């Protein structure tokens, strides 16, 4: 039995939160164009159910070979999205956080658990730029100083 929640399950969790806390959200999605990204998107859409079509205002993808995702972030901002569902690997998560901050786009930002590392994503993006992110965690991040003296390590 695995210990990591499935990507679709995580997407369902975010959908439930959005439906409960932001029922009129306009969601912009950035995802990696492969099974990893598509599983997260499927989980979100399944979790939103019949409301997905009206709530999702933009979906843009990126390839792992892309050098930046700046144009995707600008496109999502232009869509009028006030919720950003960010399904990226760490390199692109840091870029997404930073670019949104630099252009003054301040949606409610959901960051998938794959990319919620303090050391490899939040610090490179800038801790000020990372404030307010919503994510999930099922293990302690060894790069987070919060756990530096934790006896579990």
Question: Where do the language-model regions lie?
Answer:
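Extracellular/periplasmic periplasmic-binding protein-like sensory domains
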Residues: 5, 100-153
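Extracellular/periplasmic Venus flytrap/periplasmic-binding protein
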Residues: 1-103, 146-148
């Amino acid at each position: 039995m695995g210990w990591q929640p499935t990507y679709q399950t995580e997407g369902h969790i975010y959908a439930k939160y959005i439906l409960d806390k932001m029922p009129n959200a306009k969601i912009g999605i950035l995802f990696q164009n492969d099974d990893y990204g598509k599983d997260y998107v499927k989980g979100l859409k399944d979790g939103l159910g019949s409301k997905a079509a009206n709530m999702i205002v933009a979906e843009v993808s990126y390839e792992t070979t892309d050098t930046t995702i700046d144009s995707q972030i600008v496109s999502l901002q232009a869509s009028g999205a006030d919720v950003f569902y960010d399904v990226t690997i760490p390199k692109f998560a840091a870029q997404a956080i930073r670019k949104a901050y630099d252009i003054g786009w301040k949606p409610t930002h959901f960051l998938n658990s794959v990319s919620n590392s303090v050391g490899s994503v939040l610090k490179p993006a800038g801790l000020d730029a990372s404030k307010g992110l919503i994510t999930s965690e099922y293990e302690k991040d060894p790069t987070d100083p919060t756990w530096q003296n934790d006896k579990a390590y």
